Amino acid sequence: MSDVKAIIGLGNPGTEYDATRHNAGAWVVEALARDSLTPLRAERKFLGQYAKVRYAGHDVHLLVPSTYMNRSGKAVAALCQFFKLTPDELLIAHDELDIAPGTARYKHGGGHGGHNGLRDTVSALGNDKSFHRLRIGIGHPGSAKQVVNYVLGRPGKAERAAIDAAIDECLRTLPDVLDGNWAGAMNRLHSFNA
């Protein structure tokens, strides 16, 4: 397994989407940038907000695409092409309906599970699914008919606090991820529940 060299947080651009559940992946990268005291800045060549940080002794590229979710792959592919990154050097943070708020999971490879941002990313990477994922639990509304409104809705105060607590725990596991200690990172994160 290759070392993670870039962390990408998926979401939708604009203030009307900033606080929606679908932007939970972007919240991870924004929190990491704040923790690193390095602001994300608009970078046209990567179609998003970008920063290079030094975190836990590693140089890491951070990106929040400013494309809409279903076009995230364009930004991911642009970053990979510019820095000669392979898909297995990426950690992509995204919202996950199948996990409760207050929890998060790492995953290696796999399908898109109906997530439009992942679907477009897989396509833009030539159908290479070998990237790592950081799945941020947002819970499920209970009915497939309610999913679109749910992911584009804002979590309540307690739900957002639980999601933020899970993101904080993600940041505490990132040094292990960057060191290649996936077992340690997974063991810690997967046992956390806010």
UniProtKB/Swiss-Prot annotation:
Matches recorded under Gene3D superfamilies: Peptidyl-tRNA hydrolase
EC number: 3.1.1.29
Pfam families reported in the protein's UniProt record: Pept_tRNA_hydro (PF01195)
Residues binding tRNA: 17, 68, 70, 116
Highest taxon listed in the record's lineage: Bacteria
GO molecular function (one): peptidyl-tRNA hydrolase activity
InterPro entries: Pept_tRNA_hydro, Pept_tRNA_hydro_CS, Pept_tRNA_hydro_sf
Keywords of the record: Cytoplasm, Hydrolase, RNA-binding, tRNA-binding
Site note Discriminates between blocked and unblocked aminoacyl-tRNA, residues: 12
Protein's GO biological process: protein quality control for misfolded or incompletely synthesized proteins; rescue of stalled ribosome
Assembly and oligomerization: Monomer.
Protein name: Peptidyl-tRNA hydrolase
Organism of this sequence: Chromohalobacter salexigens (strain ATCC BAA-138 / DSM 3043 / CIP 106854 / NCIMB 13768 / 1H11)
Gene that encodes the chain: pth
